[in-house]
Amino acid sequence: PYSAFRKNKTWFGVSINRELYSTLAAHEATHAVAACNFRIAKPTIQAKEYLAYVAMFSAMSAELRAQALRGTRTEGFTSLDRFTPLLYMFDPMRFGAEAYRHFSSVADQTALIQDVLAGKVLSE
């Protein structure tokens, strides 16, 4: 619930508020939708989280997204190979911000989503 989330004070360097909380709901809803649409038996954590973070950042207002991206150290990954389970486990905020920045730079985003769901990318 929101009251528990609010105890964190900040997330992605942004003060906790209801708008930020609603993007967390988008993140979790994406997990549920993706789970029904993966075409492989065991998608990787990086595949699941990449999609969820892209949806979360996409659900943010432009102003909130800019604040969250500024509050997170990123390099601007150009390769999906950089999205590893270790990055997610040790720095999930960075993983999420990098995922959104990467996805935003992809010309055919629909094809990328299909490739993730098919296990063609972000796999073991």
Predicted feature descriptions by range:
Residues 23-36:
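Active-site recognition of the HExxH zinc-binding catalytic motif
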Residues 15-24, 42-47:
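Soluble non-cytosolic domains of exported or imported proteins
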Residues 1-4, 20, 52, 87, ...:
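Intrinsically disordered, low-complexity N-terminal regions enriched in serine/proline/glycine
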Residues 1-18, 32:
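Active-site scaffold of zinc-dependent metalloenzymes
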Residues 63-124:
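Long, well-structured alpha-helical subdomains associated
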Residues 5, 49, 113-116:
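Extended hydrophobic/Leu-rich segments
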Residues 44-76:
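Post-HExxH zinc-binding segment in Zn-dependent metallohydrolases
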